[in-house]
Amino acid sequence: MTVMERLANSIIVPVVVLDKVEDAVPTAKAMAAGGVDTMEITFRTACAPEAIRAVAENCPEVLVGAGTIINVEQARLAVEMGAKFIVSPGFSEEVVGWCVENNIPVAPGCVTPTEIMAELKHGLKMVKFFPANVYGGLNAMKNLSAPFVGLKFLPTGGVNTGNIKEYIDAPFIHAVGGSWVCPKADIAAGNWEKITQLCKDARAAAK
């Protein structure tokens, strides 16, 4: 199964913010126990690179990627640490070009036709749509998908257990991203059983 197939199969790509490296593996295992075996560890905190390494080395069943990547240096470091895919909040010609050149799956943030056309130039077929609830949600993605046949979206922002099925049922959605299945407060408190249940609930709601 390819990385893109794994992301679609997981349905949810948790956006994980970690303050401590030692929380990485328990978080990954808790989500995997809930049926979510992918995770996007964001580069919003200093421990992100080592957290990615920890998951890559200790949780082979989990597909770990790096999020909030805004330059090539971060992308290179993330991949060196074991990230299997890259997610960026916006479109960076340099980041996308480096990922394509190195055969690393990448989902750049694109919310306008111009950004999507720049992404398509690199042969990509999936974009991050962020923040989805600000830029028009499903209706916006539906309209954007009309001229860009075959394009898939990874929406993040405003997706939750209450509306995940509506998103996943749309033919132009590849998977959804979000942090609601792995709240930062629950990670910090070690509420692993709660995180497992949140993942189970989200997957059940998507069916």
Specify the residue positions occupied by each region the protein language model found.
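Conserved N-terminal beta1-alpha1 strand-loop-helix module at the mouth
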Residues: M1-M81, E101, G150, T161, ...
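Glycine-rich beta-to-alpha transition loops that act as phosphate-gripper elements at the mouths
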Residues: V17-D19, A66-V72, S88-S92, P108-P113, ...
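Mobile acidic interaction elements
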Residues: K29, G34, K121, K128-F129, ...
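Conserved beta-strand positions in the central sheet of alpha/beta enzyme cores
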Residues: E40, G65, V87, A107, ...
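Catalytic cores of alpha/beta
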Residues: N71-M81, T114-H122, N139, V159-A175
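Glycine-rich phosphate-binding active-site loops on the catalytic face of alpha/beta enzymes
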Residues: P89-V95, K128-L138, F172-K194
